[in-house]
Amino acid sequence: MKIADMNWAQVEAYVARDDRAVLPIGSTEQHAGLSLCVDHILSERVSVEAAEPLGVPVYPGLPYGMTPYFMAYPGTVSLTTDTYSRLIRDVLDSIATHGFKRILIVNGHGGNTSVKSTIADWTAARPGVTVKFHNWWNAPATWRAVQAVDPVASHASWMENFPWTRIAGVEYPAHQKPML
């Protein structure tokens, strides 16, 4: 279930019986002909599809991340490490304040991985709260499926090319360009 589809009383009732929540994080950056929000779209979709059958609430995904290397591409939004770390801490503070003690962060952007140290520090200061950080593509079954379709599995490759990350009206190649 999505937090967006709940009211405060439903969250209060949920936390009285379970303390799990999911927070997807992504980025807004170029992905060749795909959506600028591929990393956000994928982390949120994976989160919802995994958590919904378990009845675990999923917070709205954070659509921004750390991606300074793509700032030459129009539409990219990049946060500094300091800003992103503060954002993650503030969001975790809010989620934990309301009784969620087991929080899974599902990451969709490799550039966000450096925030793991912020999360470790935050968690160390809050006994009883556990935060796990997971890159959606690192689940063993997922990685095997990715490798079967896209052995290169790089940024904006077939690994991230799904009907829900494509832009209507954009032509896509029928084959994968070889790595240089």
Model-derived features: where do they sit?
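Extended, histidine- and acidic-residue-enriched regions that form the cofactor-binding/catalytic faces
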Residues: M1-L104, G108-L180
